[in-house]
Amino acid sequence: MGSAPDNDSTPLDGDFEREVYEALKLWKIPGIAIAVIDEESTWTEGYGIADLASSTKVEANTLFYGGSTTKAFTAALMSMLVEDNDRYPHVQWSTPVCELIRDDFVLGHPGRTADTTIEDILSHRTGMPGHDFSMGSVHAGQQATVQDVVRSLRFLPAAAPPRTTYIYNNAMYIVASHLIQTVTGEELRSLFQRYIWDPLGMSHTYLRLKDAVAGQEPLAKGYADESATDDDPQYEEVPWKDRPEISGAGAIISSVGDYAKWVHALMNPEASSSSSSSSDSTATTSLSAAICADVGTARTLIPPPSEPFLTPMAYCLGWNRYVYRGVEILTHDGGIDGFGAEIAMIPALKYGVVTMANSTYTSNFGGTCLVYKLIDDKLGIPAEDRYDWTQKYTDLVAQMDAYNANAVSYFYPTLPDPPRPGPTLPLAAYAGLYWHDGYGALELVLDAADGKLHATRTQAQYTTACALTFEHISGDFFTATVAVVGAQTVVPAEFALSPAGVPRAIGIGWEPHLGTEKRTWMRRVGADEAGRLLRGDQSHPHHAEAYVSYQREEAQLPEFLTSHLFV
């Protein structure tokens, strides 16, 4: 079911509906909601199933997680602070982040800490990789906060100098969330509500799961396809995420109807700033033309150029920007376990498309295909000249499968022939608890059934839950298959032994941006120390202290013995 203006020119017609259901079948997506904004007209429609157990259908007002589409709201709110020189003159794009949250924002080197600006963290040019597996949902036995995530960055390495390359980083938008809350003294969701959602009439948009569940509109269930073939899907329900620590990086829950109001406002900023669709007469939005232009201005080049775009993509502030078929487009996607969202808008034509769906990863594949079907329709692109988005994502899935299948040769191109027959010690000797101050705990267990080492990081403990299965390759070198919801990847792993022949550390290639040779070294800890660390009894050195500690440990100890040194 859906809603539309009273005219016959709907782009969501019967022909398009057939394409939607073909996409749902191909990409194994239970359901999807779509909105189209064309100047002053908006059409919304739901297709498929929101809840398989109850056979509840997707409606135009069904709620979905929006994932990283949250970032555009965070960037817009930050831009409002930058523009408000009366109350926040100390908040400018060039302001170093450490000047505003000095005790919390510390990177691995004092120069990097001092040099990283607000603009840098919002445009993915800090040189820091994502380190997504490092984020814990629990800190010292309590629900992790944005401050906890920010304070963990001091233990994580950079991949490039600042402002030299684009590296997408969720954690930096968590930094932005913490900065905004610290400067204003208010929760991010309250600020979103007052300055964006209420003025635009976005009455079904939330930043907390409990608020969405308590609302009037149904929240779709998320799913992952667990079938091993391309045949009928075997959907497994994915629990709703309650992750306040991801905040302005990806916690939003909304509907395509509300997002249509957001997209319309971004393309018509003066209208949105001079009037409000909220019944609250005190609700005003600061979404000015200057702010909309600011967040949509290219800041960081995203290499390399990619077909079918005419120009290299660039990252703005919460948006990607590029030229497609002769028009400039702003886009962003969002993905979170069980859900995926796509937003695209052509400001010059005041045309936008939003999709929200309830499958892991494939929501974005299918959503993108449908977004560009609608854009091509709007631009009048002949069928024979249209780019094959379905083939693009089919090839991408094949590339991911090939990468996993050939991981051993990729990570270990100089293996001896034949490989060394076994690790130095019996596998049981490597089992135990390992710790890294940024990545937390990893407990290795030997499974008697398959004779392999395994580790599990649950959703109750970590923002990104995963299960690791270790395969011996040669000597003390392994690969680890890292299974997450709806997908898996392979990373290198190796053990370091003490002179006495005791396992002292495990090095894992958690972060691909650091290169194939670098490992995150997690040191082995005993039960007493593990308990202390899990209670949060560890120091959080300022950058100067961290730098001295780094240099001292590097000079005096083997690198694998340090808790925050990466090699």
Swiss-Prot record:
The keyword Lipid biosynthesis does not apply. GO terms for molecular function: hydrolase activity. Pathway: Secondary metabolite biosynthesis. The keyword Transcription does not apply. Disruption phenotype: Does not affect the production of unguisin A and B. Disulfide bonds: none annotated. Keywords: Hydrolase. Its EC number is 3.4.-.-. It comes from the Eukaryota. Pfam families: Beta-lactamase, DUF3471. It is an enzyme of class 3 (hydrolase). Belongs to the peptidase S12 family. Hydrolase; part of the gene cluster that mediates the biosynthesis of the unguisins, gamma-aminobutyric acid (GABA)-containing fungal cyclic heptapeptides with the amino acid sequence cyclo-(D-Ala1-D-Val2-L-Phe3-D-Val4-D-Ala5-D-Trp6-GABA7) for unguisin A and cyclo-(D-Ala1-D-Val2-L-Leu3-D-Val4-D-Ala5-D-Trp6-GABA7) for unguisin B. Within the pathway, the hydrolase ungD catalyzes the hydrolysis between the D-tryptophan and GABA residues of unguisins A and B to produce the corresponding linear peptides. This is Unguisins hydrolase ungD. It comes from Aspergillus violaceofuscus (strain CBS 115571). The gene is ungD.
